[in-house]
Amino acid sequence: MELYQGVVLGVLQGLTEFLPVSSSGHLVLGQNFFGITEPALSFDISVHLGTLFAVALVFFKEIKAMVVSLGRLVQNLGSLKNFKQVVKADGDVRLAALIIVGSIPTAVIGLILKNYVHALFSSLVIVGSMLMVTGTFLWLTRHSTPGGKKVEQIGFGTALFIGVCQGVAVIPGISRSGATIAAGLFSGVERETAARYSFLLSMPAIAGAEILSLKESFATGAGFDTVTLLSTLTAFIVGTLALVALLKIVKKGRFYLFAPYCWVVGLISIIAGFVA
């Protein structure tokens, strides 16, 4: 892979990991454009680490607050009379619990689909079709009733539902952020809270996938070169900017504006797939 190709793919990963247009779908399109049939596993791991660090940077305060609250909870566990009440009343503990609950269906679905999804990355028709699906549920958020649920009002059933949507987003062309934020909005969650939860929920999913991929990478002896490292840095910088921008867009209720883009790119992908 040439240096400029790695940088372009890093930009694509950084932008599309958080914007609701499917990072996996766009990486497939980018790889097809450059004629890269099978990118190095170490490259895939690295660019995803770049976007994981972007989430950690943007939500550092929230992550720190959750860690502190959970630490305090563990220290006082023996003296707590009503554990459930504490989880419900403490917003930081509640958020951590919701992330854990939401991560369960994501992990189960991801492990089940892992071997089947790999083959889909070579199909422009499937990627394009799933982008059309992504565009449709993004557009439907325009008609969702604005909810007011904050973290303390989100039920574990809602967390499971959002986690299922995140798991399904392993299919290339289905946007993870689009699916999870839309699921939150349809469930009556307040816009900014839905976005915050979506991106914090992505951290265990990305980290878990990275651990599995690293194990495979070490087994194959894959290494990390200059192109890979520069792509990672690019994904981190662009991802941070994209994440901050999307939070503002969701807060203003303009999430649906990404739908036409998904439809256009999806249609082009389907046509290109049939022509090829």
Curated annotation (Swiss-Prot):
Known EC number: 3.6.1.27
Gene Ontology CC terms, in alphabetical order: plasma membrane
Record key words, sorted: Antibiotic resistance, Cell inner membrane, Cell membrane, Cell shape, Cell wall biogenesis/degradation, Hydrolase, Membrane, Peptidoglycan synthesis, Transmembrane, Transmembrane helix
Signal peptide start-end: none
Record-level Gene Ontology MF annotations: undecaprenyl-diphosphatase activity
InterPro entries: UppP (IPR003824)
Pfam family, one: BacA
Catalytic reaction annotation: di-trans,octa-cis-undecaprenyl diphosphate + H2O = di-trans,octa-cis-undecaprenyl phosphate + phosphate + H(+)
Membrane topology type: Multi-pass membrane protein
Biological processes annotated in GO: cell wall organization; peptidoglycan biosynthetic process; regulation of cell shape; response to antibiotic
Subcellular location, principal: membrane
Compartments, as annotated in UniProt: Cell inner membrane
Organism domain of life: Bacteria
Transmembrane segments: 1-21, 40-60, 93-113, 120-140, 154-174, 199-219, 227-247, 255-275
PANTHER family named among the record's database cross-references: UNDECAPRENYL-DIPHOSPHATASE
HAMAP family: Undec_diphosphatase (MF_01006)
Note: Bacitracin is thought to be involved in the inhibition of peptidoglycan synthesis by sequestering undecaprenyl diphosphate, thereby reducing the pool of lipid carrier available.
Role noted for this protein: Catalyzes the dephosphorylation of undecaprenyl diphosphate (UPP). Confers resistance to bacitracin.
Record protein name field: Undecaprenyl-diphosphatase
Native source species: Desulforapulum autotrophicum (strain ATCC 43914 / DSM 3382 / VKM B-1955 / HRM2)
